[in-house]
């Protein structure tokens, strides 16, 4: 395969606009899976997604030029799904299933376009909102994050000369390859790329994906990035995200409905998908409360993705719950995906090996680890915790608690109401870097 010289490309900016988002498929696969369900079941729900910089010490509006940001957002607005992309979505097999996307949904999707954005700045931060039907606004999450992340990378490299850029990418490649060699020592490990939203750049993500494909072979199970899956003949991977229970909970009218909201999401999901896509994301309002109130049928699902508890503690709690429900954990799947670095992956692998099926969704540490790679110290390569979350549904505030209080999102009064209702049992505060 012909690999572009990334350093040369970064250095030679002779074009008017170098698009960060090249396709509406440059997103996570679970956004399309969720979109089909949202379009089918919740066509009249309006939501707001909001960019949230959890690393307040990093002033994004000082690092990133507003004109460049608007140009990239405007370019994303201009994108439509191409005929080739629609044929691929219709004809490809995903998770062993053909026609996972129904013809009526694809007919609607071919004319899809992102809704307008609202951008202002305050105290060194960008205030970025996306309003509109849930079936449209949801698709801004990944492009918005990838645009901010790559613009930050470009700003960091703006004053590097050609030689310094060569050194930067040579060191980053060596750093990445040393991680690949570390993973090769773990028999039967399953690794996938979950690094789109906070990647250094699209070209760098592609290089990392191809490095994993070359380096660990069948242990590399695929990528969450739909465009890269299509381009590199990999599996497109992903299930569902916190936005589903966040929105459904925000729409409830009483405590009984609020209690049932996380499980209503699973029932909706099961109407659309099955088999290996039956993965539970338990931590939106706290894993402990979710497990305590879960109907027995939840234990029949394929697996869980513990997303905010420490991986070993979170995995052990779910294994214990499976055993309480009479299930053999060795037949179940745990997908670990929260702030993983290669050492955490290795430790978690050794801890659970032989006790449960495992897979690791490797994100920012895979696609944006440039710390120490530049010839001189560049602060803007330091880790940034940036998210784009649903904050309102039909005018009501949406909340995410999570097992880590540092990740709590929402209106303070609503957060307290949710804490009073769901509790905070077994919440563990951990620093968040990504």
Curated annotation (Swiss-Prot):
PTM notes: Transiently phosphorylated on a His residue during the reaction cycle. Phosphorylation strongly increases the affinity for substrates and increases the rate of nicotinate D-ribonucleotide production. Dephosphorylation regenerates the low-affinity form of the enzyme, leading to product release.
Domain of life: Bacteria
Pathway listed: Cofactor biosynthesis; NAD(+) biosynthesis; nicotinate D-ribonucleotide from nicotinate: step 1/1
Keyword annotations: Ligase, Phosphoprotein, Pyridine nucleotide biosynthesis
GO cellular component: cytosol
Catalytic activity, EC: 6.3.4.21
One GO BP: NAD biosynthetic process via the salvage pathway
Keyword set includes Phosphoprotein: yes
Reaction equation(s) it catalyzes: nicotinate + 5-phospho-alpha-D-ribose 1-diphosphate + ATP + H2O = nicotinate beta-D-ribonucleotide + ADP + phosphate + diphosphate
Residues bearing the modification Phosphohistidine: 242
Name of this protein: Nicotinate phosphoribosyltransferase
Organism of provenance: Bartonella quintana (strain Toulouse)
């Amino acid at each position: 395969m012909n690999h572009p010289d990334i350093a040369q490309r970064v250095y030679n900016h002779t074009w008017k606009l170098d698009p960060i988002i090249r396709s509406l498929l440059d997103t996570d696969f679970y956004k399309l899976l969720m979109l089909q369900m949202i379009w089918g079941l919740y066509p009249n729900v309006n939501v707001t997604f909001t960019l949230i910089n959890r690393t307040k010490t990093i002033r994004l509006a000082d690092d990133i030029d507003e004109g460049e940001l608007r140009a990239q957002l405007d370019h994303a607005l201009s994108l439509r799904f191409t005929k080739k992309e629609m044929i691929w979505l219709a004809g490809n097999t995903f998770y062993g299933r053909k026609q996972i996307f129904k013809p009526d949904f694809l007919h609607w999707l071919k004319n899809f376009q992102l809704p307008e954005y609202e951008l202002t700045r305050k105290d060194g931060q960008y205030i970025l909102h996306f309003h509109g039907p849930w079936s449209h606004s949801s698709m801004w999450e990944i492009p918005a994050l990838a645009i901010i992340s790559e613009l930050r990378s470009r700003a960091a490299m703006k004053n590097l000369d050609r030689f310094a850029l060569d050194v930067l990418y040579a060191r980053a490649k060596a750093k990445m390859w040393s991680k690949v060699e570390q993973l090769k020592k773990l028999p039967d490990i399953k690794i996938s790329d979950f690094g789109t939203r906070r990647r250094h750049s699209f070209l760098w993500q592609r290089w990392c994906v191809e490095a994993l494909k070359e380096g660990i072979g069948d242990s590399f199970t695929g990528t969450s990035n739909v465009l890269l899956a299509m381009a590199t003949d990999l599996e497109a991977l992903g299930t569902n995200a916190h936005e589903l229970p966040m929105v459904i909970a925000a729409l409830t009218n009483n405590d009984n409905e609020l209690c049932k909201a996380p499980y209503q999401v699973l029932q909706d999901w099961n109407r659309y998908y099955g088999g290996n896509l039956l993965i539970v994301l338990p931590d939106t309002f706290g894993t402990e409360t979710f497990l305590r109130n879960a109907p027995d049928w939840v234990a029949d699902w394929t697996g869980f993705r513990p997303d905010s508890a420490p991986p070993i503690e979170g995995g052990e709690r779910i294994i214990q719950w499976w055993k309480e429900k009479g299930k053999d954990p060795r037949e179940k799947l745990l997908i670990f995906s929260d702030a993983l670095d290669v050492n955490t992956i290795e430790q978690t692998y050794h801890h659970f090996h032989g006790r449960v099926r495992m897979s690791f969704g490797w994100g920012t540490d895979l696609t944006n680890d440039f710390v120490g790679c530049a010839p001189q110290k560049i602060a803007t390569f330091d880790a940034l915790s940036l998210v784009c979350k649903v904050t309102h549904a039909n005018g009501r505030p949406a909340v995410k608690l999570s097992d880590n209080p540092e990740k709590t999102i929402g209106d303070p009064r609503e957060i307290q109401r949710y804490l009073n209702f769901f509790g905070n049992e077994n919440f563990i505060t951990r620093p968040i870097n990504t």
